């Protein structure tokens, strides 16, 4: 599979011979959906706490006598049927949202995403990317010269501090190391800018 490599002016400079296993795979929507949902589920933390009927504070006195009032039987105002009572199935911080995806499925799913990005011309490869100083203006000028304004994911083989600092104030741009690339980020951004060394890292991890 040949990928187009651009220069800093956004013009095609060369072709990169990439792995067909990683960039020439058919798109499997069901598999991609599964790994995206699993990734999001595994990122969840149990941060909600509700009380059941044994945990709410309430009197133990029976609200009214069992018979003779014409009203329904009631034994406690901590009942889930009552306002202020406990929940029937309360949320707990101990809930486990994790979903298991085996390595083979994950690799296949990432390959399907990268292949589809390449087919849709949303994957752009550059020889290397850096900025001279941690200035957002310098970074935005560089992206503009490459014609890559807008919703953009930038992936490098190693995190460049100047690149990271100059991009973190941009709401539509995210800079990641290759080993931090995840399915949610890859499908979310309109364009993905990848360095040649990052492509090699992808092939090493998922190829």
Swiss-Prot record:
One of the protein's GO biological processes: translation
Keyword hit for Zinc: no
Keyword Flavoprotein: no
Keywords from the UniProt entry: Ribonucleoprotein, Ribosomal protein, RNA-binding, rRNA-binding
Pfam families, A to Z: Ribosomal_L4
Organism domain of life: Bacteria
Listed Basic and acidic residues bias regions: 45-58
InterPro entries recorded: Ribosomal_uL4, Ribosomal_uL4-like, Ribosomal_uL4_dom_sf
Gene Ontology molecular function, alphabetical: rRNA binding; structural constituent of ribosome
Disordered as annotated region, ranges: 43-94
GO cellular component assignments: ribonucleoprotein complex; ribosome
General function of this protein: One of the primary rRNA binding proteins, this protein initially binds near the 5'-end of the 23S rRNA. It is important during the early stages of 50S assembly. It makes multiple contacts with different domains of the 23S rRNA in the assembled 50S subunit and ribosome.
Complex formation: Part of the 50S ribosomal subunit.
Family: Belongs to the universal ribosomal protein uL4 family.
HAMAP family with a match to the protein in the record: Ribosomal_uL4_B
Annotated protein name in UniProt: Large ribosomal subunit protein uL4
Organism: Dechloromonas aromatica (strain RCB)
């Amino acid at each position: 599979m040949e990928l187009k490599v651009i220069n800093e002016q956004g013009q095609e400079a060369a072709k990169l011979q990439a792995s067909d296993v990683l960039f020439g795979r058919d798109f499997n929507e069901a598999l991609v959906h599964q790994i995206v949902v699993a990734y999001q589920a595994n990122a969840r933390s149990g941060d909600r706490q509700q009380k059941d009927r044994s945990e709410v504070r309430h009197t133990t006195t029976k609200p009214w006598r069992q018979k003779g009032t014409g009203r329904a039987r009631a034994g406690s105002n901590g009942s889930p049927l009552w306002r202020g009572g406990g929940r029937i199935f309360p949320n707990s911080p101990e809930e486990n949202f994790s979903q298991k995806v085996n390595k083979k499925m994950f690799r296949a799913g990432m390959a399907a995403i990268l292949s589809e990005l390449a087919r849709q011309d949303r994957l752009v490869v550059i020889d290397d990317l850096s900025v001279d100083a941690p200035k957002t203006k310098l970074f935005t000028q560089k992206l503009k010269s490459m014609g890559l304004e807008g919703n953009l994911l930038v992936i490098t083989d190693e995190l460049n501090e100047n690149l990271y600092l100059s991009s973190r104030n941009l709401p539509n741009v995210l800079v990641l190391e290759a080993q931090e690339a995840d399915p949610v980020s890859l499908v979310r951004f309109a364009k993905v800018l990848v360095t040649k060394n990052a492509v090699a890292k992808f092939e090493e991890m998922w190829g």
